[in-house]
Amino acid sequence: AYEIRLSLVGSEMSIRDRDIERLGCKVWGLELFGRRSNQTLRIYIDKNEGISVEDCEKVSKHVSKVLDTENDFSENYMLEVSSPGLDRKFFYNEQYKDYLNEPLKVTFFDSQNKKTIQGRLEEVDKSSIKLEMKEGPMQIAFSSIIQANLII
């Protein structure tokens, strides 16, 4: 189990994975964006059987309660809870290993250039992924990945 801590409009909150697991789901990832006075917290949840509207509603109610009661948020915020979708974005290195041999789109820094490539996920180790492409294999360090998504 892990704990995710983030700063939202000047206050700190934590979302414990075990709390979401008690609701039958796991946290796939978090995004925080928007202006300071009107931020959006997007939480992606997942489970083996797929996510239902009811799952999103349960998690949303739980997280809203945490935001509204355990923290003093004086600014407006919007909470979104959803499935990561078929073209899911990867948030954590551990997520890649379940998608071996699947096609990925990866945006990363190569030296000082930003590149986007597509290939089949061939290998995952502690520090990188290996994609098989038409031009041959390419190893990409996790530290250089900006964003990676499944291709549907």
Kindly give the residue locations of the regions a language model identified.
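Short Lys/Arg-rich amphipathic alpha-helical segments
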Residues: 11-12, 16-118, 122-152
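Single conserved hydrophobic/aromatic residue that forms the stacking wall/gate
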Residues: 1-10, 14-15
